[in-house]
Amino acid sequence: MKDSEKISHTRVDSKNYKNPLCCRKIIEISSRSNRSVKELKSLLTGRGIKRHGKTLVSGKKIVSELIRFNPDIILGWISSAGSVFLPSPVLLDIPCYKVTKELFRELDIHGTGYPLLVVKVPECVPYQENKISDNVILMIAFQDPLNVGAVIRSAAAFAVTSIVLLKEAASPFHPKSIRAAGTTVFAAKFMEGPSINEVRSIDRSIIALSPQGIDINSFSFPERFVLLPGVEGPGLPPGLHPDFMVSIPMEPNVESLNASVATSIVLYEWYRLKR
């Protein structure tokens, strides 16, 4: 047994669920130095997510959807001391981490107050352009997990399924990214790509965004292309020369759009024109 960790089994009140009474494993944790706590807290970082192959999911809507549609990826759930309850009978045989209120608040970074899920992160396959049949590839180098999540959601909405995560990109399974993307992040298939400095394309045009680019309203999208928004702030590296640069018209008193918003507009315009 790990330090400061108490394992017990409790019975579920049949008044709450129609299924028979069942034992449930509860792991009670009170110490901040506990190894389980350290691992759970590391899942709030991209490095910890990659190391352990797990992440944390919060929010009643997302938690409920995962329980309903993706129960196989759920490894555990976390509840605050004094308020342990089952969000669903699906979790009856899945371990529950019962932590102190203070620790729960640290893990529940969005302040939902609802039980958290510990879920398995899908593996990313290496990027190989010649094995992708889709005409459009989205390459993400965003370093803000909120932007990563937002653009993944937009990609799903506009039928872009080939998503390459460049080395600069934040984890799409960071809790902030999941919050922005919703459950679409668990349906997406990601590929691990090179650094943005090394991006090349075999048979697709590379399209980037720039205020000095072609007005998107008059731009004709090639049949096959790579959309490469760049990194927030710096944009594209000096050595990268895209085939096309497109711009989004806006009021002159606005300096620029958020990176994920601008990318979403381009994806929508392509989607609208191809329909």
Give the ranges of each region predicted by the language model.
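Boundary-proximal intrinsically disordered activation/regulatory segments immediately upstream
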Residues: 2-82, 169-170
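Short, charged/polar "capping" segments at the starts of alpha-helices
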Residues: 82-88, 172-174
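RNA substrate-binding interface of SAM-dependent RNA methyltransferases
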Residues: 122-213
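Structured adenosyl-cofactor binding patch, chiefly the S-adenosyl-L-methionine
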Residues: 115-119, 156-158, 169-186, 238-275
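Short acidic-hydrophobic, aromatic-tinged amphipathic segments that line or gate anion-handling sites
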Residues: 28-30, 96-100, 188-196
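Glycine/small-residue-rich loop that forms an oxyanion/phosphate-binding "nest" at active or ligand-binding sites
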Residues: 96-118
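Active-site/ligand-binding-proximal alpha/beta "capping" segment
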Residues: 208-254
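Amphipathic alpha-helical repeat scaffolds
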Residues: 59, 143-151, 257-262
